[in-house]
């Protein structure tokens, strides 16, 4: 499994105001020593990871991307939902269910 976000699948997140997260946010992930490791962009709709048009719900600084619809990995059949290792590895999902050929 290539996803780095499995703990987020189907989980609804709220902002500091208690309302479901909306829009996008940039975060910096840190290692156990508190040093910055990598930037990540997260896109939300109604508290769930969700693509914004053609933009993936999750973009890591190292080019790892994950497409989501309503909190679950999703892309149409001809497109991978998860793209890792600079495009050399891909996984296909529809509504959170992995699709194999």
Q: Where are each of the predicted segments found?
A:
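Glycine/tyrosine- and acidic-biased, solvent-exposed loop/turn segments at the edges of beta-strands
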Residues: 1-101
